Amino acid sequence: MKKVYILSFAALALSWSGCTKLNEDLHGQVGNGAVGSDDVAGLLAASYGAMVGPYQSPWNWSALQEVTSDEIIVPTRGGDWDDNGAWRALHLHKWAEDHQRISDVFKDLGTITYLSGDLLRYNPTKQQAAEARFLHAFAQFSILDGWGQVPYREPGESSTSVPKVRKAADEIDYLIDELNAILPDLPEGKANTIRANKDAARVLLMKIYLNKGAFLNRLTPTFDAADMGKVISLADDIATGGYALTDHYFDNFAPTNNILSTENIFTAQNIGGSPGSNLDEEWRCTLHYNQNPSGYNGFSTLSDFYNKFETSDTRRGGSYAGQTDVSGLQIGFLVGQQYDQDSVALKDRNGNSLAFDPMVSIIESNRNHLEIAGIRIVKYPVDYVNSGSKKPENDWVYYRYADVLLMKAEAMLRNGQGAAALTIVNTIRTKRGASALTTLSLDNLLDERGRELYWESFRRQDLIRFGKYLNPWQEKPTDDPKYLLFPIPDNQLGNPNLVQNPGY
């Protein structure tokens, strides 16, 4: 088994650029001797584990989807959070080919595709193969979303070989065929949310059909009626799985969300106290140093985004049992004076009131404002049982039923079924304590997706699909269409099949 696990975890360093001595050594090690069923299970576990880095933290894929949007800003706070301008570049759409965050995510997504594809040469069971192929497709979809072209190797192809590349149209066709092929061999959905499952594959297919027009023409997307019909029928298939909107919105993300949520479709299992999860970074990246848990005082929400919520909307946040009574920390958006569990007002490091101000600039220099600038976000309730150096119990959420319903509503609206779409949206809004909409437009549907799915790594994709990504918003001017795609990192262009995206 040792030879397999050397591959599984050391391969996290793989990139798409081509041949390295490390790659040659890895490939040679796994070729020695037979691989048994336990080894294949280990390889599959490593494929799931490889998803933690790019997806299960605010620093990587989430940063590329959220900090580049109208939802999140990471202001430079005096000498804190400068990072050579990396965070400012994401929000302002001023990144270049050498942006480290973009490079790291591209590499990490490639690691998932390598591990999950390589597993197929070791005689997996039908279900193991289907799960691996789903993870492969999941990561490839992200690469397509971000970069518009997808490097790939055939299963079992040497890690020293130069990857071929599929452009958007071919990749879309490939992903649709691949997901339809593996559907029969995946486990059923609701009982297997922590694994690749049939309903997770259907959600990914929905996202492919819904974004197809945007992936083919990002500047002026079009939406084929047949593609929208596929989105609707897939949503109907998922609806037979017994999902329902969870009574308490934030229970979808709680330490016991595997029990409390009735709408989670695909999650990553986290076991409290065990290594492997980065989920605690979700609250540390945004909370102040003097809060519990102590944070890094970074990520904030823009006031224009926050103001999209009605005061009655439970998604905006408030007190949360097991969190507010333990530390004083509320859930959702944190605005104004912050308190501890005894209702004592907290201070910042300068002795000023720790009262988060909705007004925030991308560069904060006022000593009395820089620590309190910006609304903070706590989407995942804190696991105080597994705090400090331990890892939280909350399962990471990839797909939820609410997203399925909103995608169905969007497809209906784009196909001229506005009344039915409005009914779906109002079902969600009523569940969340918001007033019913009287009409549904693309603009207020985009707003509703923001309200329901904030901090879940969909905002950039949504803004591009709705034609809003290049628009100005707080602390960002109108910008160049080249930013509809990320640049191929400089260190990947040793692959002659990768061509730098236009404008870079």
Where are these regions (language model features)?
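Bacterial Sec-dependent N-terminal signal peptides
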Residues: 1-28
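Long, intrinsically disordered, low-complexity segments
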Residues: 17-21, 40, 72-73, 79, ...
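Membrane-proximal, proline-rich intrinsically disordered regions
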Residues: 19-68, 487-504
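Short, surface-exposed recognition loops and adjoining beta-strand edges that mediate ligand/DNA contacts
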Residues: 33-34, 38, 58-76, 153-156, ...
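Flexible, polar/acidic helix-loop-strand segments at domain edges
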Residues: 87-94, 311-400
